[in-house]
Amino acid sequence: MSGFFGVASKEDCVTELFYGVDYHSHLGTRRAGMAVYSEGKGFSRAIHNIENTPFRTKFDKDANEMNGNIGIGCISDFEPQPLLIQSHLGSFAIATVGKINNHDELVKKVYEEGTCHFQEMSGGMINATELVAALMCTKHSILAGIRYVQSLVKGSLSIMLLTSEGLYVARDRLGRTPVMIGKRDGAMCATFESFAYMNLDFEDHYELGPAEVYFFNAEEGRTIGEAGDEMKICSFLWVYYGYPTATYEGVNVEDMRCRCGEMLAKRDAGKVFPDSAAGVPDSGLAHAIGYSNYTKIPYTRPFIKYTPTWARSFMPTNQKQRNLVARMKLIPVHKMIKDRKLLLIDDSIVRGTQLRETTE
């Protein structure tokens, strides 16, 4: 998973951009980047590896040196971005969120349409964001390019694009990932996570529909590409990926998890009789709270996540490392475990990594 944030302001926007991007750190731990535009300096950009260093620490120096009124940034679990592009459409910076399943097919198509090379490689593959930019630049306008890419991509793709005039943002064709617009006096922003602008004094302004394309500057925004009718948002945003304070399509993540726990409790009524209900941190906690609230079974925390250093266990790229993180990040409270019947709720049981390591 990845996340992005963009802002246009009458004042310098780098502080808002810095913290807005940082609020997406739960969505990725490999790469991060920021790009800004100022009339005096033009485009400037910074990209860093954040696998072993948090975003704020890595980008603190860049944030103090950059300046501009418009900017975009991203946390990426795959390719380095944003990318700076010079083309017949003008100069722009671009960041994407999603997964292109027909990547190789589209690379071949770009070659056939006249592009002779790609510059960016990530893990032996052509950078997906550069691929998107190459496809866009075969058309006569940015909007036409975005629509063209949306029609070709199999998988998911949301786009954020920075120009000297303002920001373009396009939600995935089927709305699989969210895009929210925030607004305050003299500034507007776009974000994957709705809560990312709450502490920056922005207020909820608009949520893009599937395939919708939106343009904004510091003063105003407008839809330039109408939304589609079909919505297939990723349900795992509520179950796992999303931060508890996030809201997608009017449904808050924490509230949804509590209600899921309540539904589990209704299913179990009269069948199980635990001493306490508990969740595997972090995203399992609200499920357990919902279960406890409905059944009146005490909610306890027999496993505590060591939050200062351990990331979410889905983030490492190899399974061995995932297993290690899953094992090391949770510390048991034996007083709350020994001789007790626990009902333990976990949302990550595809591979059984978390639940197996925890219960053993």
Task: Name these PLM-found stretches.
Residues 196, 203, 208-212, 266-269, ...:
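Phosphate/diphosphate-binding loops
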Residues 123, 251, 255, 317, ...:
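Alpha-helix capping and helix-loop boundary segments enriched in small/acidic/polar residues
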Residues 60, 64, 86, 289, ...:
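Feature captures the catalytic cores and cofactor-binding loops of soluble hydro-lyases/lyases
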Residues 246, 271-301:
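Hydrophobic alpha-helical segments characteristic of transmembrane helices
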Residues 296-343, 352-357:
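Short, glycine/charge-rich flexible loops or terminal/linker lids adjacent to PRPP-binding catalytic cores
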Residues 99-100, 280-287, 350-352:
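Gly/Ser/Thr-rich loops at beta-strand to alpha-helix junctions
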Residues 1-209, 215-275, 280:
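Conserved short alpha-helical segments that host acidic/polar catalytic motifs at enzyme active sites
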